[in-house]
Design a protein with these regions (language model features):
Chain A
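Conserved ABC ATPase "signature" region
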Residues: 110-128, 179-180
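ABC ATPase NBD coupling module
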Residues: 68-81, 104, 109
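Conserved ABC ATPase signature
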Residues: 132-136, 140
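Short helical segment in ABC ATPase nucleotide-binding domains corresponding to the A-loop/adjacent helical element
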Residues: 95-103, 113
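Hydrophobic anchor residue at the start of the ABC signature
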Residues: 146
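The feature captures the beta-strand-to-loop junction immediately N-terminal to the Walker
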Residues: 36-38
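A short, proline-enriched helix->beta-strand linker immediately N-terminal to the Walker B motif
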Residues: 151-155
Length: 210, 328
């Protein structure tokens, strides 16, 4: 296996009593892959392993853009994460959420401003930039989390059941925004989901975990 | 039978609720009644004129000032210690965590008098070489134990480094006959029977309560915030400073307030380690004791009421913060 932006080779994870059986996957640059499987099969564990958020022994190889990243800290991997529970920082406004990564990486103020405004325009967040997370609806919060994850132009976008808990109308709206943003940003994406319909609507390829 | 109306036979018989409610009200009323009687007893013992007379006394005014200063200093120190300790215990799983946790609760479990006695012995009877030797031994045992259980390399290196440092200091102080008190007095920070000693006597118990509060605070803040911050480029320290600390603000205030209230009520350790010298190391708790000793019961009651007022105000602040949805 080689050539993919993300290559997982016989990855095994031990997390307490749970052991993830050897799993392999290759995602090509610009591809959107949906990862499906029954509850408890280890989808989120695998996603967190790719992001570097799992403490504990990880077997096999996790290669991002040709570089073995197993021993790299999460922030050095160039991955954007939209978690299932959204996890917006409660004390930061929408603008500050999106600026968080670029500021941390020392971007110039004008670059940050331009990036925030461009993302806010694409995500329909222009009127919400000064709002705190507590004043946002579920769909708006998902769009902010997507903007925060994309702000640094990651080489891989990981979405962990990012649409769960939304009503049908909001679900379809956010799904459309995600699809549009993945295309517009040209980012490679790994989307973990329970829903076959969602997987087929968003992904170029669906991978099922046992 | 009319449609929609349940006949008497179909209603299940349920025993009445009032006996249980009456039991709850009785217990709560009895307990609150006792507390009310305790406060009332003080109020009935002292008149306004007696209260105002004792509060005008220069020594008592010094005692009130010293109480505020020492309680505030203890609260600040407690917060400075409890934030990192609470975070470590909340977020890191490590071998020996239960042991550290138990050790940190010792000041809460022990009779406060023992804290004072231990401080008195430590500062005046134990030579500095022995103190350093004990710390070196403790660090060495922890390092060996950690290494045997394949613990974190950096922590083990730190422990070994500390063991070496304290071991060397132990040799440096080996010939010295001075006590720890002698050394701290020489550098300008006398402790025993000195106002600074009041803070040290208040600190162990107050800090233990603050640690508990901070640990609960951090337990209630989801580690997902740090994880997301880390994917955006933060290291653990940056995630803590930028994301967790702002969320823990109310918990920090609550920990400080709790430490302040504990320090206010401290008596035994202060009496033994700092003494109860009028106009020097006397704080409100020791003032009450001194007033009783000289037979001024109304004076002692007036000071007790002042302390009750301070304690209630402090607790109200904590409750208020907790009620506003803070992580307290």
């Amino acid at each position: 296996m080689s050539g993919g932006i993300l290559v997982l080779e016989q990855v095994t994870v031990q997390a307490g009593d749970f052991v993830l059986s050897p799993f392999s996957l290759e995602i090509r640059e610009g591809e959107c892959v949906a990862l499906m499987g029954p509850s408890g099969c280890g989808k989120t564990t695998l996603l967190e392993t790719v992001c570097g958020l799992r403490e504990g022994p990880v077997g096999g190889r996790v290669v991002l853009d040709g570089l073995e990243v197993k021993n790299l800290p999460p922030g050095a991997r160039g991955i954007g994460l939209v978690p299932q529970d959204v996890v917006l920082f409660p004390s930061l406004t929408v603008r500050e959420q999106i600026e968080f990564g670029p500021k941390l990486h020392g971007w110039k103020p004008e670059e940050i401003k331009e990036r925030v405004e461009s993302l806010a325009r694409d995500l329909g967040l222009e009127g919400l930039l000064s709002r705190l997370p507590e004043g946002l609806s579920g769909g708006e919060a998902r769009r902010v989390a997507l903007g925060r994850a994309l702000a640094l132009r990651p080489q891989l976008l990981c979405l962990d059941e990012a649409l769960s808990g939304l009503d049908e109308a909001r679900h379809d709206e956010v799904l459309g925004v995600i699809r549009k943003m993945i295309e517009r940003e040209g980012v490679t994406a790994l989307h973990v989901t329970h829903s076959k319909k969602e997987a087929e609507a968003i992904a170029d390829r669906v991978v099922v975990m046992d | 039978m009319e449609k929609g109306i349940i006949s008497d036979q179909k209603i299940w018989r349920v025993r009445p609720e009032w006996p249980f409610l009456l039991f709850l009200v009785f217990v709560v009323a009895a307990y609150l009644g006792l507390l009310l009687l305790l406060v009332g007893a003080n109020m009935l013992t002292v008149s306004w004129s007696q209260a105002s007379e004792i509060l005008k006394d220069a020594d008592i005014q010094h005692s009130i000032t010293l109480t505020f200063v020492t309680c505030t200093a203890t609260a600040i120190l407690s917060v400075l210690v409890s934030v990192p300790v609470g975070y470590l215990l909340s977020r890191y799983q490590f071998r020996g965590r239960a042991l550290v946790d138990t050790f940190l609760d010792i000041p809460i479990l022990l009779p406060p008098l023992i804290v004072g006695l231990s401080l008195l012995i430590l500062f005046n009877r134990i030579p500095p070489s022995a103190c350093c030797g004990m710390l070196a031994g403790g660090a060495l045992i922890a390092a060996i134990w950690g290494a045997a259980r394949k613990g974190n390399g950096i922590v083990i290196q730190f422990l070994v480094g500390s063991a070496i440092l304290f071991g060397l200091l132990s040799f440096v102080f080996a010939g010295s006959q001075r006590s720890l008190e002698g050394i701290v007095s020489e550098v300008g920070f006398p402790m025993t029977f000195h106002p600074l000693g009041v803070v040290l006597a208040q600190f162990p118990v107050a800090a233990a309560f603050a640690v508990r509060t901070m640990r609960t605070t951090f337990d209630q803040i989801s580690p997902r915030y740090e994880e997301v911050a880390m994917t955006l480029g933060c290291n653990r320290g940056q995630a803590f400073m930028r994301v967790v600390l702002p969320l823990a603000g109310k918990g920090i205030v609550a920990a400080g307030t709790m430490a302040w209230a504990r320090a206010l009520g401290e008596f035994g350790p202060i009496l033994i380690f700092a003494g109860a010298t009028r106009g020097r190391t006397e704080v409100l708790a020791t003032s009450v004791f001194l007033e009783i000793n000289i037979g001024n019961l109304p004076g002692a009651a007036a000071l007790s009421l002042l302390m009750i007022l301070l304690a209630v105000s402090t607790l109200l602040i904590v409750r208020c913060l907790a009620g506003r949805g803070g992580a307290v």
